[in-house]
Amino acid sequence: MITKRIIPCLDVRDGRVVKGVNFADLHDVSSPVELAEYYSRAGADELVFYDITASAEGRALFTDILTETARRVFIPLTVGGGINSLADFDRVLKCGADKVSVNSGAIRRPALVGEAARRYGDQCVVLSVDVKRVGGAFRVFARGGRDDTGLEAIEWIRRCVGEGAGEVVVNSIDTDGVKRGFDLEMLDAVCRAVSVPVIASGGAGCIDDFLTLFRAQPRVDAGLAASIFHFGEVRIDDLKDAMARAGIPVRIVAAAQAERSETCSTSTN
């Protein structure tokens, strides 16, 4: 049985991890390299790095941070932000990324998805979609959630998967940072439309939100979150223990268990 993945998301601006609500009101959190190392030890299955202002500012994605992170962690890295060409794919992959996430770049030039899939393989191409309800419809937003593209989200996702995207990260702007649970209705629509792995993003506030996600939408492959992990509201090992007890298939990392045991031992001495 395929295990469900737990993926911390590191939104990076000016070399620091930040987090806000509804894609706005951003606050400084930590060093991305140090935070990535922590999550690697804590049992995260993968990491997602987004340079959240690269597209809006029309500049290249951070590569120095990525290179240093790839040297220190040994779990898969997905990296996005400012990906507009095959040259951007090349640069990010050479710096140590395992997968490349494309969002606004695909909206500007949809052929990029197919070109990248043919060159690197569809397993390397992750479609990231920022979705918000507008007039009852799911609409695609670009430039870090700033611009309404007018694209209908489910059709856009179906189109890009048809071009070769091997995985989809669905970012709910409506629930981002709100901590009231994932957007199950939207995720259901996406899972019905495509057969590639779907990663749910936006809305996690507690362990029960992940349990509800995987029970209600068993076709969702992974849950992605930021602030609840960054601020210690949910520990990844505690989350995975709860998932295992609930019968949800999950990878338990021995290193994370050992670190927790050592912490507990220290606290009782």
Across the structure, where does each feature detected by a protein language model lie?
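Structural preference for beta-strand elements that scaffold enzyme active sites
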Residues: 5-9, 46, 74-78, 99-101, ...
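Catalytic cores of alpha/beta
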Residues: 73, 77-99, 185-222
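Conserved, mostly hydrophobic/aromatic
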Residues: 11, 39, 47, 79, ...
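C-terminal helical cap(s) of enzyme catalytic domains, especially alpha/beta-barrels
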Residues: 113-120, 214-254
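Conserved anion-binding
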Residues: 12-14, 18-19, 97-175
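Glycine-rich, proline-tolerant flexible connector loops at the mouths of alpha/beta enzymes
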Residues: 46-64, 104, 169-181
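Glycine/small-residue-rich loop that forms an oxyanion/phosphate-binding "nest" at active or ligand-binding sites
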Residues: 53, 61-122
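Charged helix-capping and loop-helix junction motifs
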Residues: 60-67, 110, 150-154, 180-189
